UniProtKB/Swiss-Prot annotation:
It comes from the Bacteria. Keywords: Cell inner membrane, Cell membrane, Membrane, Transmembrane, Transmembrane helix. It is a multi-pass membrane protein. This is UPF0259 membrane protein SG1383. Belongs to the UPF0259 family. InterPro entries: UPF0259.
Length: 250
């Protein structure tokens, strides 16, 4: 019997609704960790002020990003690199904790062993190093694909979408999980492509919303936006987990 997308969406929404409080708490907790870590690792306000030294908006409006970086001093480039690295690392840690905690929570609930959010994160600890490498590699490849030409990035996002579920469910390494995910993804494109595309569009919408709050320095606003982004990712992970369980049974 073929797997129906409508069944997957219904199962996803049922689980999301039944475990909403725990999922919301996990999304906000990982968002808070990500924001605090990014703030702790980022350059201080005085260092960030050096990025605007000697630059004028009128002069840089026509420049590409590469030209803008080339116009910076060595100190400004160092500050920019540190800020970018801090944001990337903080986001990566948040995504790893979210994926590990949520996938562990789903597995425990499916086995009729409900756990708290902190307990789920604790149980996922042995999986976190593997997920860290996996999510780093997949994020890097997808981002490169989106930067070069959008289509390859989307295809890579679809190809590697099942990898976190495979890594945690089958106890496989990052490369093997990515390889197995690719073969399954393109064999089940009709079930994966719409979900991944919706996830990409929803994350882009949250990013656009975040740009409207660039003048708002409130930690609460930043955490809430990150939490919303995490909820979107949580929906996709629930969908992917259910799909993979059905594929294993087929």
């Amino acid at each position: 019997m073929p797997i129906m997308a409508s069944t997957l969406y219904r199962d996803m929404l049922n689980f999301f609704r039944n475990q909403f409080a725990s999922i919301l708490l996990l999304a906000l907790l990982t968002a808070l960790i990500s924001v605090v870590l990014g703030h702790a690792l980022s350059p201080g306000s005085e260092q960030l002020m050096t990025l605007s030294d000697g630059t004028h908006l009128g002069d840089t409006a026509e420049m590409s990003l590469q030209q803008l970086v080339q116009q910076m001093s060595v100190e400004q480039q160092r500050v920019l690199l540190k800020a970018s690295a801090a944001g990337t690392l903080a986001g990566l840690v948040g995504n790893v904790l979210l994926a590990g905690g949520l996938l562990t929570m789903i597995r425990q609930v499916s086995n009729r062993q409900p756990v708290s959010v902190l307990r789920a994160i604790g149980l996922s600890a042995p999986l976190l190093p593997r997920l860290l490498l996996l999510i780093f590699l997949t994020t890097l490849l997808v981002q490169l694909g989106l930067l070069l030409i959008i289509v390859p990035g989307i295809l890579l996002a679809i190809a590697f979408s099942l990898a976190p579920v495979i890594a945690t469910s089958d106890d496989l390494g990052a490369i093997k999980s990515m390889r197995q995910s690719s073969s399954l993804a393109f064999a089940n494109l009709r079930l994966l492509a719409p979900a991944v595309l919706f996830w990409l569009l929803a994350k882009a919408a949250v990013l656009l919303l975040a740009t409207q709050f660039t003048l708002v320095s409130s930690l609460v606003a930043v955490v809430l936006l990150n939490g919303l982004s995490n909820l979107i990712s949580a929906l996709l992970l629930i969908y992917l987990y259910r799909l993979y369980m059905l594929l294993r049974q087929a």
